[in-house]
């Protein structure tokens, strides 16, 4: 009888410990649940030692009431360089920013064409950064 009580007691403690560990674990996707920054950044490629920032340019277009604003820009690097990484950083952090996409070129090429499309009734405010290497 004493052994059965001891086993039951240990089973209850084991269950309590398991529930305590499950309940204290951080929620899955905690970073994604953090809604403080809702920017629509585009990052393509990756940097390696020896890469350098060859272009940093702001792209700003005012909003047009009830309309979608589209801006398409082509960026080039010198003929002996290749693009390794492109960052289109949305400066609006409230979720009203534009969306960036690459329509031509990109990492491994000497040029890239980026299309920026705003949400209806909002403008465009991006910083474009291009990294390359020889």
Swiss-Prot record:
Keywords: Secreted, Signal. Residues 1-24 form the signal peptide. It holds the Pfam family MBF2. One of its GO terms (cellular component) is extracellular region. The keyword Signal applies. InterPro entries: MBF2 (IPR031734). Its main location: secreted. It is found in: Secreted. This is Probable salivary secreted peptide.
